[in-house]
Amino acid sequence: MPELPEVETIRRGLSRFIVKKTLKHTTILCDKSFQGTPTNGTVKNIRRFGKALVIDLDNQKSLMIHLRMTGQLIYDDKSRERYAAGHPSDNFTAALPNKQTRVILEFDGGTLYFNDQRKFGFIKVLPTAEVEQDPFIKKLAPEPWNMSADDFYVKLQRHKNSCIKPTILDQTIICGLGNIYADESLFMAHIHPKRKCGTITEVEAANLLAAAREVMDKSIASGGSTMKDYVKADGTKGDYLEKFAQVFRREGKPCPRCGAEIIKFKVAGRGTHICPRCQHA
């Protein structure tokens, strides 16, 4: 599943291609993948709420899109130049639509295909005024950039008996951190992922929040991570893992800070990477 930096990269890329273009027709090939009544209108802008994209039209309607695990957005303009984002596959270069195409959005300048192999993603039409009240979006906590260190510390103390890693993965506590960026943020802040939230000091909470901001800023700047289920809006891969990742998927390699061997184990069912020396329990 793409994480916040990947979805932000997609938002920026697609904004260049479809903002000010007019949506003229919608073809629904899978009822499960489309919620609401199809609508036409000119794209005003594209917003992001956590890992969801919202395309605002000039008719007071919006399209909320969630790629989930294997969703793709592939835009073909009239010159047949193709821009693609999401789960990488031959669909990026193959003829479209195909057996994985769930929804087709036809614009005056080209066509946007929503493909989804596993049918977990969706497009939902709703009034623009109601977007922020949608149950999926309403439950999201503030993102790291929009949360104070004091508020973050208070939230952690409300879950004092929970381990820190699954707590910061909870989108109702802090929005945007997925598995990659949780590991990287905890490493940067010298915090073991199994520590109970009640043991985290105010200083440590502030350091962790700052680390999360820095990690995600770097990832957005580099176009996101390179994972098997994600590529950028122009079809190329992000290079955060290659350029900046210090522990994620680096098990067996030396810690860039102290030289100890990075190890991998599971926390709350999630693969977790740490330096056992820098992040002692």
For the regions a protein language model found, what residue spans apply to each?
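Generic detection of long, well-ordered alpha-helical segments
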Residues: 1-4, 95, 146, 201-209
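Short, glycine- and charge-enriched coil/turn segments that flank and shape catalytic ligand pockets
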Residues: 58-60, 131-132, 203, 260
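Low-complexity, intrinsically disordered regions enriched in charged/polar residues
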Residues: 4, 63, 134, 146, ...
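Short acidic/polar alpha-helix capping motifs at helix-coil junctions
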Residues: 4-8, 15-18, 131-132, 220, ...
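A cross-family signal for N-terminal binding/gating loops and helix N-caps
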Residues: 1-115, 120, 254, 270-281
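Phosphate/anion-contacting hairpin/loop surfaces
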Residues: 63-176, 181-188
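Basic, nucleic-acid-binding surfaces and adjacent catalytic neighborhoods in DNA/RNA-processing proteins
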Residues: 22-38, 42, 73, 81, ...
